[in-house]
From Swiss-Prot:
Gene: OPG075
GO cellular component terms, semicolon-separated: virion component
Keywords assigned by UniProt, alphabetized: Disulfide bond, Electron transport, Redox-active center, Transport, Virion
Entry's Gene Ontology molecular function annotations: glutathione disulfide oxidoreductase activity
Organism name: Cowpox virus (strain Brighton Red)
UniProt xrefs under PROSITE patterns: GLUTAREDOXIN_1 (PS00195), GLUTAREDOXIN_2 (PS51354)
Subcellular localization(s) per the UniProt record: Virion
Function: Has thioltransferase and dehydroascorbate reductase activities.
Domain (Glutaredoxin): residue spans on this chain: 3-106
Protein name: Glutaredoxin-1
Alphabetized PANTHER family for the sequence: GLUTAREDOXIN-1
Similarity field: Belongs to the glutaredoxin family.
One Pfam family named in its UniProt record: Glutaredoxin
Length: 108
């Protein structure tokens, strides 16, 4: 059931971030991503409160990404990890290039 919940939300040419809005790391990750202008439908924020039991979802995250914590961030169907991973990419000034290369940013 957790697999279906996650896989239905992942797609090529899309950024998906699984969050808990009470989590400061999730809010920080959203702040980074919200600096960019995404094409309609190319960016989805999923509150993990939508899924019960939460532990089942976290177990599935661990199975496919190696981590149970949120945020869990996916570029297409590929996990890039969590907040610290996103921050590292952003600090290298590579995030915009990566997002452009997967076709999720507006060009105008």
């Amino acid at each position: 059931m957790a697999e279906e919940f996650v896989q239905q939300r992942l797609a090529n040419n899309k950024v998906t971030i699984f969050v808990k809005f009470t989590c400061p790391f999730c809010r920080n990750a959203l702040d980074i991503l919200n600096k960019f202008s995404f094409k309609r439908g190319a960016y989805e924020i999923v509150d993990i409160k939508e899924f019960r039991p939460e532990n089942e979802l976290r177990d599935y995250f661990e199975q496919i990404t190696g981590g149970r914590t949120v945020p869990r961030i996916f570029f297409g169907k590929t996990s890039i990890g969590g907040y610290s991973d996103l921050l590292e990419i952003d600090n290298m000034d590579a995030l915009g290039d990566i997002l452009s290369s997967i076709g999720v940013l507006r060009t105008c």
